[in-house]
Amino acid sequence: MITITEAAQNHFVKLLSSQPEGTQIRVFVANPGKPTAECGVSYCPADSVESADTHLKFNLFSVFVDPISAPYLNEAAIDFVTDELGSQLTLKAPNAKVRKVADDAPLIERVDYVLQSQINPQLANHGGRVTLMEITDDAFAVLQFGGGCNGCSMVDVTLKEGIEKELLQQFPELKGVKDLTEHQRGEHSFY
């Protein structure tokens, strides 16, 4: 469920050494499955462990995860990175905003997952997003752009060279993508 590097484990052991005996680590997701999802790490006093928590045992400490956060922390990774500017704990949880779907889920769910977890975070850098409207009977993913992508002069390149290539690579059963958006250039447009 959660991978913790050796450097991060050592950091946790150091932090826990100054806490009351029995204190462990809790990893959680606030607003799981939503665009506003945020991951967190906190101390977990012994009296705050719930019977429904997932208990992950590491060499010198344990991590507890509440049942609501657990599916959103699948494939999460915690690292402790040190560089010339200092050090910091990093937590990457690719499924925090969108729960990973099963490999045998319907095509529309799998495509939507890739859009939400891989494509939209990139588009968000420009204030944009894309929504899957449908998959047609002839295997085209019909998309609608929003935010900074609506009216952007680069939207055709983004659609064909970025999104379509990625989706066709991951889903060979698709024939392509179509843009349903009525693009209106304005101040919101990125380019």
Swiss-Prot record:
What cystine pairs are annotated?
A: none
Q: How is the cofactor bound?
A: Binds 1 [4Fe-4S] cluster per subunit. The cluster is presumably bound at the interface of two monomers.
A molecular function (GO) term = 4 iron, 4 sulfur cluster binding
* Gene3D superfamilies, per the entry: Fe-S cluster assembly (FSCA) (3.30.300.130), HesB-like domain (2.60.300.12)
Q: Does the keyword DNA repair apply?
A: no
Q: Which InterPro entries does the record match to this protein?
A: Fe/S_biogenesis_protein_NfuA, FeS_biogenesis, FSCA_dom_sf, HesB-like_dom_sf, NIF_FeS_clus_asmbl_NifU_C
Sorted alphabetically, which keywords does the UniProt record give?
A: 4Fe-4S, Iron, Iron-sulfur, Metal-binding
Family designation: Belongs to the NfuA family.
- What does the UniProt function comment say about this protein? Involved in iron-sulfur cluster biogenesis. Binds a 4Fe-4S cluster, can transfer this cluster to apoproteins, and thereby intervenes in the maturation of Fe/S proteins. Could also act as a scaffold/chaperone for damaged Fe/S proteins.
Which NCBIfam families does the record match to this protein? PRK11190.1, YhgI_GntY
Subunit and partners = Homodimer.
Q: What is this protein called?
A: Fe/S biogenesis protein NfuA
**What is the originating organism of this protein?**
Hamiltonella defensa subsp. Acyrthosiphon pisum (strain 5AT)
